[in-house]
UniProtKB/Swiss-Prot annotation:
Keyword Kinase: no
Stretches assigned to the Extracellular side: 44-56
Listed transmembrane segments: 23-43, 57-77
Protein name: Protein MGR2
A Gene Ontology term for the protein's cellular component: TIM23 mitochondrial import inner membrane translocase complex
Organism listed in the record: Saccharomyces cerevisiae (strain ATCC 204508 / S288c) (Baker's yeast)
Keywords recorded for this protein, A-Z: Membrane, Transmembrane, Transmembrane helix
Location in the cell: Membrane
Amino acid sequence: MPPLPQNYAQQQPSNWDKFKMGLMMGTTVGVCTGILFGGFAIATQGPGPDGVVRTLGKYIAGSAGTFGLFMSIGSIIRSDSESSPMSHPNLNLQQQARLEMWKLRAKYGIRKD
């Protein structure tokens, strides 16, 4: 039975996937930051008329929304520069050279230690 064909390159995530990943990472950081700063503000200044839970929730929601928004936008901006083929004209040549080196190493049993 012949071996299965191997894919040498994996498909990159789409911009929508990068947006969602940035949103989730930013929201997670925002929740942690909101708990820390909100807890500190409540401990030093008191909860105010809304109470502890509602005040802490406001801090968490505000920082989670802000961090999530900026991280998602930043991940899209960062991924736009990689999508243009003219940004790295020698990238295809570099990938071909690596593939040929990999084939030669596999053919002659040369291991990189």
